[in-house]
């Protein structure tokens, strides 16, 4: 993935911290990152994900994109439905202008 960029990067219910900076770098100029996964506090709600290695720390997604992407929306919430869960969600966009030369075309 290093060196490749995409107009959209979407991650749900997955956290592998060594990849986080690469995910931000993979957002093409004018592109968007949408990320949602479990957060600290989930372990107290009876959720399956309880290992701190797989739970976002408070504000971790905000820290990740700071200085790289513009935050469009962010939540650090406890959901009640369908099952109680602590999650963080972020939608952030590249502030660079989108241009067609940034699109990768595959043969």
Label the predicted regions.
Residues 52-68, 72-73:
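Short alpha-helix
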Residues 76-107:
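Core SAM-dependent methyltransferase catalytic element
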Residues 30-43:
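Conserved beta-strand signature within the Rossmann-like core of class I S-adenosyl-L-methionine
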Residues 3, 16-20, 55-58:
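Structural motif corresponding to alpha-helix initiation and N-cap regions
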